[in-house]
């Protein structure tokens, strides 16, 4: 009976981790594709220039693949050490995510202030050599969200030391339109505009977060159940 339970949990655990591993492959693939084809689209942050979407996806995908591989191998080999390693790695990720979420909600105001300050510092790198990614990122955001600057279009005045903005701030794009009168520019601040957009899509973000947590809890349950079954089987055989 113990052996039958072990086999059932074993194949469930393997199937779960195979999907987990394939998901990691997908995330890694998207990250590599972004790095190869959209490498010029990088971070908006001046403090964390390597914190681009491509780099985050590559790191996340590789880590998920590694965890999934350990889980698959542990399930097939019925290895207690690998199963426990998988459990601890997944638990560490789960606790890290929970800690980040708690800190984010606890220090929302401070994070808001720091983010705006950092983004304003990043504006001074706009259009400079070696910062094509940041330049393109700002151009895309201002065009798509119909906004200008971090907290106001006047943020750009400090960058240019003149009454002008990038052409991506213009209501109707044309060459050097950023030199025209303020009435021809978007007035909405980009930080608040993007923040409102995220709040409007909070339900989708919440559902994604909940699904991620449930998948991780399921993985933890499978790992610990199989670990216990392997221990029981070893005890029974002994």
UniProtKB/Swiss-Prot annotation:
InterPro entries given in the database record: Tetraspanin/Peripherin (IPR018499), Tetraspanin_animals (IPR000301), Tetraspanin_CS (IPR018503), Tetraspanin_EC2_sf (IPR008952)
Keyword list, A-Z: Cell membrane, Glycoprotein, Membrane, Transmembrane, Transmembrane helix
Gene Ontology biological-process entries: protein-containing complex assembly
Cytoplasmic side: 1-13, 77-85, 223-238
Annotated transmembrane regions: 14-34, 56-76, 86-106, 202-222
Main localization (coarse): membrane
Topology of this chain in the membrane: Multi-pass membrane protein
CDD domains on file: NET-5_like_LEL
Glycan attachment positions: 152, 161
Topology feature Extracellular, residues: 35-55, 107-201
Record note on what altering residue 67 to M does: In a breast cancer sample; somatic mutation
Tissues/organs with expression: Expressed in multiple tissues but is absent in brain, lymphoid cells, and platelets.
GO cellular component, one term: focal adhesion
Subcellular location: Cell membrane
One MF term in the entry's GO annotations: integrin binding
Pfam families per UniProt: Tetraspanin
Subunit structure: Forms a complex with integrins. Interacts with HRH4.
The family this protein is said to belong to: Belongs to the tetraspanin (TM4SF) family.
Biological role: Structural component of specialized membrane microdomains known as tetraspanin-enriched microdomains (TERMs), which act as platforms for receptor clustering and signaling. Plays an essential role in migrasome formation and migration on retracting fibers at the rear end of migrating cells. Migrasomes are cellular organelles that form as large vesicle-like structures on retraction fibers of migrating cells. Mechanistically, acts as a membrane curvature sensor and participates in stabilizing the migrasome structure in a late stage of biogenesis.
Protein name: Tetraspanin-4
Organism for this UniProt entry: Homo sapiens
Organism lineage string: Eukaryota, Metazoa, Chordata, Craniata, Vertebrata
């Amino acid at each position: 009976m113990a052996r039958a339970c072990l086999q059932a949990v074993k194949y469930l655990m393997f199937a779960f981790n195979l999907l987990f591993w394939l998901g990691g492959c997908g995330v890694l693939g998207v990250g590599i594709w972004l790095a190869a084809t959209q490498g010029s689209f990088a971070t908006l942050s001046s403090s964390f220039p390597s914190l681009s979407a491509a780099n985050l996806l590559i790191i996340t995908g590789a880590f998920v693949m590694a965890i999934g591989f350990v889980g698959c191998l542990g399930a097939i080999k019925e290895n207690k050490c690998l199963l426990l390693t998988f459990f601890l790695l997944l638990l560490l990720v789960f606790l890290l995510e929970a800690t980040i979420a708690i800190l984010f909600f606890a220090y929302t105001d401070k994070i808001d202030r720091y983010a705006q300050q950092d983004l304003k510092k990043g504006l001074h790198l706009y259009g400079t050599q070696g910062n094509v990614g940041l330049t393109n990122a700002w151009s895309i955001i201002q065009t798509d969200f119909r906004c200008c600057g971090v907290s106001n279009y006047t943020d750009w005045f400090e960058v240019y030391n003149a009454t002008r903005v990038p052409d991506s701030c213009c209501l109707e794009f044309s060459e050097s339109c950023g030199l025209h009168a303020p009435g021809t520019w978007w007035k909405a601040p980009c930080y608040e505009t993007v923040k409102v957009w995220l709040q409007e899509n909070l339900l989708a973000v919440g559902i994604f977060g909940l699904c991620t947590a449930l998948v991780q809890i399921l993985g933890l349950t499978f790992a610990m159940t199989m670990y216990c079954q392997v221990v029981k089987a070893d005890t029974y055989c002994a």
